[in-house]
Amino acid sequence: MPAFPLPDQCQFIDRPSPTTAAEVMHDMDGRVDMVIDGGPCHIGVESTIVECSGDDKVTILRPGGVTIEMLKEIVPVVEMDTTLVTGKGVPKAPGMKYRHYAPSAPMTVVVGTEDKVTAKLQSLYEGLKAEGKTVGFLVSEEVGSHFPHKNMYVWGHHDDKEALANQLYTGLLSFDSDVVDVILAEGVDDEGLGLAIMNRMKKAAGGHVILVD
């Protein structure tokens, strides 16, 4: 057995989190003696980090699989840390201070209705193609049907946030293998699980998010 077992979701801080044993082995090959495969992460954007202030209040420092709506069922007062709302100040939670969960290629995230996201991605794609860039797409089935299928990772249907949360990191890691110059990604609204998804996507994109509603 290895002398020092690794925790789940072990990773390098500047890389997307591995959510399968194969992805852990890819990152840790040559650094560890063994990887025990307990199956893929169930949610994908796993941990919600909160600060507890007495019995009746929690402050969300990093959104995750446990959503605001879930917390409100058991805690009277649930607030967001001001750094999440304003984007200013020093975040308290790990992984919130710098560009994090990031693929090798720069990424732009587009958020809005299906039609407007498709149109904006098409415009961005045409410009990048004219520059000779190789583009990767992280999109839903509906939006993906409008683009070449090479270098594309499709997570599922447009409104399936659970599928995107589950496959986000696997999708980002796939582009490191495909060697793309730029990643164009379809985001979601920040309701429910969407809050955690967009938190991770914004970090991966270095804040480069375009709203087209």
Language-model regions, residue ranges each:
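Active-site-adjacent structural elements in enzyme catalytic cores
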Residues: 1-213
